[in-house]
Amino acid sequence: MDPLRAQQLAAELEVEMMADMYNRMTSACHRKCVPPHYKEAELSKGESVCLDRCVSKYLDIHERMGKKLTELSMQDEELMKRAQQSSGPV
């Protein structure tokens, strides 16, 4: 696969993953913070605060997980390089 096509696929996958994360966050926070039977057309103060906190926590955890996965991936790459260097030419 040529590098340009690989880059396009990676970008498409990233957009798809972000859309999925947004949809899951929206659904989870809506279920948690907004009752199924609306009493008013507008969000109440409590609902609004709940949604704000829920989204904030969701994004914070998403960022932390991304950093940890990047860290683990870099460690794996380093271990692979060391293993290749120690095995030497075959």
Curated annotation (Swiss-Prot):
Pfam families: zf-Tim10_DDP. GO terms for biological process: protein insertion into mitochondrial inner membrane. The keyword Transferase does not apply. Keywords: Chaperone, Disulfide bond, Membrane, Metal-binding, Mitochondrion, Mitochondrion inner membrane, Protein transport, Translocation, Transport, Zinc. It is a peripheral membrane protein. InterPro entries: Tim10-like, Tim10-like_dom_sf. The keyword Electron transport does not apply. One of its GO terms (molecular function) is metal ion binding. Its main location: mitochondrion. A motif (Twin CX3C motif) lies at residues 29-54. The twin CX3C motif contains 4 conserved Cys residues that form 2 disulfide bonds in the mitochondrial intermembrane space. However, during the transit of TIMM10 from cytoplasm into mitochondrion, the Cys residues probably coordinate zinc, thereby preventing folding and allowing its transfer across mitochondrial outer membrane. Belongs to the small Tim family. Heterohexamer; composed of 3 copies of TIMM9 and 3 copies of TIMM10/TIM10A, named soluble 70 kDa complex. The complex forms a 6-bladed alpha-propeller structure and associates with the TIMM22 component of the TIM22 complex. Interacts with multi-pass transmembrane proteins in transit. Also forms a complex composed of TIMM9, TIMM10/TIM10A and FXC1/TIM10B. This is Mitochondrial import inner membrane translocase subunit Tim10. It comes from Bos taurus. The lineage of its organism: Eukaryota, Metazoa, Chordata, Craniata, Vertebrata. The gene is TIMM10.
